Amino acid sequence: VLFRSIVGTKTDYFGIPILANILTGANGFSEVWGTKLELLWYYFKLLILPWPLSWDYSYSEIPVMSLSHPLAWISMVLHAGLLAFVFLRFRKQPFLSFAILFFLVMMAPTNNFFIYNTTTLGERLMFVPSLSICLALVFIAGKLTKTDWKLSAPLLQNNSIKILLPVILIFSIMTISRSADWKNNLSLFKSGVEVCPNSSRTNYSLASEYFKQAQKTGNDELKKEYLQKAGQLFQRSVEILPENYQDRK
């Protein structure tokens, strides 16, 4: 990944619109690296607390950020600390060190730090890296309850389950709640605008869906309402990103 980033540094962003990846709108060393560190922070946040969620995080929900912003430094210290822990504690804490290293390595190809891609931030890119938090939670639960994982014991009699079950329950409820947003395009795009109101794409997509609904309905009042909402959202999308070609069609 590092070699690919060095070789492709000058061409990785070629042809990628700012609507897809905000890094193409970053100018100079400070903005490029400040924004990269900002994205690392958001990916870490998704790992620890994946709520609220959106199907899209494009321009300008996540703004271009310079190195003068505190969040960039917080992210830098955080990730430097994670790397330091891996190298300094690997022999004494191999399980937790592996979990951290797994997260960092699995995120490397898609988090825009080394290689630009066509997504500013994507929850789907966390599918494999999220295994790291599962490993870390098992380790932490075992430490808190002084569980010896080498000893075989019935699962429900394991003290660590007292910690893990509530966590599993909470995240299961969050998953079920989030799944409701995926009922159809209208519900999904509505939730996208609610969570990411500053994304040109979420506004455009909901506007397009309202326009489609207006064409389908036979109710004149409802059609008028849908078209009015579509117009407002199209306007908002253009305000966020005037060069969004989709809204000019």
Would you name each region that the model predicts?
Residues 1-248:
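Polytopic membrane enzymes that build or remodel cell-surface glycoconjugates and lipids
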